[in-house]
Regions:
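Phosphate-binding glycine-rich loop
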Residues: 1-45, 59-63, 68-71, 136
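Conserved core segment of the aminotransferase class I/II
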Residues: 151-178
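Alpha-helix N-cap/helix-start capping motif
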Residues: 2, 28, 50-51, 104, ...
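Conserved active-site segment immediately N-terminal to the catalytic lysine
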Residues: 123-157
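PLP-dependent aminotransferase-like
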Residues: 36-125, 132
Length: 178
């Protein structure tokens, strides 16, 4: 992107407290870039909730991976940790949390579970860009997080999305894919 896009990325890095902020033309493209960056291969599984926009699952299908649907908590509508754990198999590559209605997923439990099973976590925070989890912005505690900038979201640029990560390698891969 040009100088204004780069300026916007730097501002997002400062605001969200992330090492890298990477703009994309849509949040769907952001999810596709995030999934590609973690090295998903055909047949790999990514655990996600069906309680979200279809882009969360279709971005998984873009890489010929398989979305595995886990239940949600009734109070937050975010992933239920016990359901996520019950759905982990030898084919599971990642967990995609969906922060929704201003609620953050239980990131301590998700990251602990991911570490236990050597999985990556992608946080789809399109519906909760200002939500806090232990004084940190939702989306910044996962390996990769991101936000929709669509015209009907809290922060908008007309269209687009922004990925955040603190991992240099993942950031470079996402820049190549976008």
């Amino acid at each position: 992107g040009g100088p204004k896009v780069q300026e916007f990325e730097r501002e997002c890095e400062r605001y969200f407290g992330a090492k890298h902020a990477i703009t994309v033309n849509s949040w769907t493209s952001g999810l596709i870039a995030a999934i590609g960056a973690i090295g998903v291969e055909p047949g790999d599984e990514i655990i996600v909730t069906p309680w979200t926009m279809c882009a969360s699952a279709t971005a998984i299908l873009h890489w010929n991976a398989i979305p595995i649907f886990a239940d949600i908590e009734t109070e937050t509508f975010c992933l239920d940790i016990a359901s996520v754990e019950a759905n982990i198999t030898h084919k599971t590559k990642a967990i995609m949390s969906v922060d929704i209605f201003g609620h953050s997923s239980d990131m301590d439990s998700l990251m602990s579970l991911a570490k236990k099973h050597n999985l990556k976590v992608i946080s789809d925070t399109a519906q909760a860009p200002g939500a806090l989890y232990h004084e940190k912005y939702a989306g910044t505690l996962a390996d990769i997080g991101g936000y929709s900038l669509n015209y009907h979201k809290h922060i908008h640029t007309g269209e687009g999305g922004i990925l955040v990560t603190n991992d240099d390698d993942l950031a470079n891969r996402m820049r190549l894919i976008r």
